[in-house]
Amino acid sequence: KIPEVEEYTRAELLAMEKETAGLYLSGHPMDEYRAAVRRAGIVPIGAILTDSASESEKKTYPDGAVVTVAGVVQSSRTRTTKSNTLMSYINLEDDTGAMELIAFQRALDTGSIYIKDNAPIIVRGRISMRDEKEPQLMADSIRPITDLGKLKPEPPRTNADSKLWVKLPGEDDPRLARIELILTMFPGQQQMIIYLECEKRRIGARCLIHPSLIAELKELCGDANVFLEAN
């Protein structure tokens, strides 16, 4: 008698297809969530990629836009930054496309438990455009797909005109070099101003204004020396 073997679940079958063929053949893991995703106002990854590739100057999802996406984790890797905090690169795919997410310590503190291969997740964050690269998403929060019902539709928002101020005593302050290093992890086109108090001079820089960036700067320079000016 041939022993009975439990049938694979749909999710297991799809994962096997992806592993062996390099693509999903009989469907996509996000198919069963499509209606709920639409009701929640989730932005399709393909829409972000298409908008980025468009030659139009007026973007629907510009640098710094806040969006929520949902998809399955294709891969992830975590490393420790020079400021001794964790940073993860996550490849997320929905049924319209795939994009890279970057999650820092703040998002990982509550969301790392959900980052598993083939796991469906919801990610809220800010779009980061850099040079000719495809857009990335700087994650603010990572949640399980079961939280879909708790989401309310909302349009993408930007704070493109905001300015981030950091105050230092002078140019010889060793923290200036640390700030420059931190900024390399938050590429973007939003304005940051470092005010050198003794010299009464300003240094301008461009970055993606992100909660994790603000948190890192406050830890380095003190809460009173970091200020977000929202226009």
Located regions from the model:
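Noncatalytic, beta-rich nucleic-acid-contacting surfaces in large DNA/RNA-processing enzymes
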Residues: 1-231
